[in-house]
C-alpha cells in the first residue's frame, strides 16, 4: 500500500506535464504565494491498554483533552508548471497550554465493564504541539474562477503533555473503590508524547466569485504510523506504543476576501481524525531494569479541531 501511495505521488507531476506549453518554463520563481495566520487548536486523544490473555479486553484508558491552544501557522505554495504546485506548511503552539487528563482502569475481569480505579488530573498542560507538511497538487481543472485537483503529501504531528498532582479513587486489597486520596499538587504524575507520521492522498478545490474565494480540502490515509511514550513517574515505568497503518481523515474549509489583487484575508477550519487501532507496547521499569514487549496491547485514537485567521499574499 505504501508503494502505491508513493507511485501516485511521483506520477502527479508527470500526469500534467504534457499540458505545459513550450513557452512556459518548468520553474517560475515569481509564481509563489505565502500565508501566515494565528489560530486555535482543540482536541482529545485516547490512550488505551488491552489484556491479550483475557480476550483483548480493555483494562486502561487515559483521556488527554485540551481546548483553545494558541497556534501560529504559515505556508508557502510554489507553482512549478501550470497544473502542478508544491506546498510546504506548518504550525506550532505558543507556550504551555491548559489541558486535562483522566486515567481509568478496569482491573476486575469478573466485572469488565465496571471501572476499579480512576484518577483526575486538572493540572495538566499541553507543553507543545507542532506539525509540518509537504504536498504536491495536480490541477484537473484550473480556471480563473474555479479549480479542482488531486493532492498527495506527507505530514508529521507531535504532541507533548505533562500531568501534575491530581486526585484518585483506587480499589485495593480486594476492595472496590475503597481508597481515596490526592497527589501533591506540584508532583509530576504522568508525561506523555505522541508522534503521527502520515502519508496521504486527497482532493482540493477552490471557487472564486468577484473578491470572495471559497476553498475545501479532503485528505485520507490508511498508512499512518503512530507512536507514543507514556512515563509514569511514581512507578518509574515507561511505556512505548507503536501502531501501524491507522486510518486518517481530514476535512478543511476556508473563505477569504481579496483586499488587493495579491492579498487575501481568510478564515479556515479543519477537523482531523485518526481512528482507533491496536498495536504493540514496549515497557521498561527503571527501578528493576526489567523490560519487555506485548503484542496487540495498546491503541491510540485522536481527534482535533483547528481554526485560524490570517493573510495570504501572491507574488
From Swiss-Prot:
GO CC annotation terms, alphabetical: cell outer membrane
GO molecular function: aspartic-type endopeptidase activity
Keyword Metal-binding: no
InterPro entries: OM_adhesin/peptidase_omptin (IPR020080), OMP_A26_sf (IPR053724), Peptidase_A26_CS (IPR020079), Peptidase_A26_omptin (IPR000036)
Keywords: Aspartyl protease, Cell outer membrane, Hydrolase, Membrane, Plasmid, Protease, Signal, Transmembrane, Transmembrane beta strand, Virulence
Induction remark: Transcriptionally regulated by VirB (InvE).
Catalytic residues as annotated in Swiss-Prot or TrEMBL: 103, 105, 230, 232
Gene3D superfamilies named among the record's database cross-references: OMPT-like (2.40.128.90)
Origin superkingdom: Bacteria
Outcome of substituting residue 6 to L: In plasmid pINV_F6_M1382
Organism of provenance: Shigella flexneri
Localization terms from the record: Cell outer membrane
Role, per record: Protease responsible for the cleavage of IcsA between 'Arg-758' and 'Arg-759', removing the entire alpha domain from IscA localized on the bacterial surface. This proteolytic activity contributes to the maintenance of a tight polar cap of IcsA, which is important to Shigella actin-based motility.
Biological process terms in GO annotation: proteolysis
Name of this protein: Outer membrane protease IcsP
Its EC number(s): 3.4.23.-
Effect of residue 182 to T: In plasmid pINV_F6_M1382
One Pfam family recorded for the sequence: Omptin
Similarity section: Belongs to the peptidase A26 family.
Predominant localisation class: membrane
Membrane-topology annotation of the record: Multi-pass membrane protein
Signal peptide interval: 1-20
Amino acid at each position: 500500500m505504501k508503494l502505491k501511495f508513493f507511485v501516485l505521488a511521483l506520477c502527479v507531476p508527470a500526469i500534467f506535464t504534457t499540458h505545459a506549453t513550450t513557452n512556459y518554463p518548468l520553474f517560475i520563481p515569481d509564481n509563489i504565494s505565502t500565508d501566515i495566520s494565528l489560530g486555535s487548536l482543540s482536541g482529545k486523544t485516547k490512550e488505551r491498554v488491552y489484556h491479550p490473555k483475557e480476550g483483548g479486553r480493555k483494562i486502561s484508558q487515559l483521556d488527554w483533552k485540551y481546548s483553545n491552544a494558541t497556534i501560529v501557522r504559515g505556508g508557502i505554495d510554489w507553482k512549478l508548471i501550470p497544473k502542478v504546485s508544491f506546498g510546504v506548511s506548518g504550525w506550532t503552539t505558543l507556550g504551555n497550554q491548559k489541558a486535562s487528563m483522566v486515567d481509568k482502569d478496569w482491573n476486575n475481569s469478573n466485572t469488565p465493564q465496571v471501572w476499579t480505579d480512576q484518577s483526575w488530573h486538572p493540572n495538566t498542560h499541553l507543553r507543545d504541539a507542532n506539525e509540518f507538511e509537504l504536498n504536491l497538487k495536480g490541477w484537473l481543472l484550473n480556471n480563473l474562477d474555479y479549480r479542482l485537483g488531486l493532492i498527495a503529501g506527507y505530514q508529521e504531528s507531535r504532541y507533548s503533555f505533562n500531568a501534575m498532582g491530581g486526585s484518585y479513587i483506587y480499589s485495593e486489597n480486594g476492595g472496590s473503590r475503597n481508597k481515596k486520596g490526592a497527589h501533591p499538587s506540584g508532583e509530576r504524575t504522568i508525561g506523555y508524547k505522541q508522534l503521527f507520521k502520515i502519508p496521504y492522498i486527497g482532493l482540493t478545490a477552490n471557487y472564486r466569485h468577484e473578491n470572495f474565494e471559497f476553498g475545501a480540502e479532503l485528505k485520507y490515509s490508511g498508512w499512518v504510523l503512530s507512536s507514543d511514550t507514556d512515563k509514569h513517574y511514581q512507578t518509574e515505568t515507561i511505556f512505548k506504543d507503536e501502531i501501524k497503518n491507522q486510518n486518517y481523515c481530514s476535512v478543511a474549509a476556508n473563505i477569504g476576501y481579496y483586499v488587493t489583487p495579491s492579498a487575501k484575508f481568510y478564515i479556515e477550519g479543519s477537523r482531523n481524525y485518526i481512528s482507533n487501532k491496536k498495536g504493540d507496547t514496549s515497557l521498561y521499569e527503571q527501578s528493576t531494569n526489567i523490560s519487555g514487549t506485548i503484542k496487540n496491547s495498546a491503541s491510540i485514537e485522536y481527534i482535533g479541531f483547528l481554526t485560524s485567521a490570517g493573510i495570504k499574499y501572491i507574488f
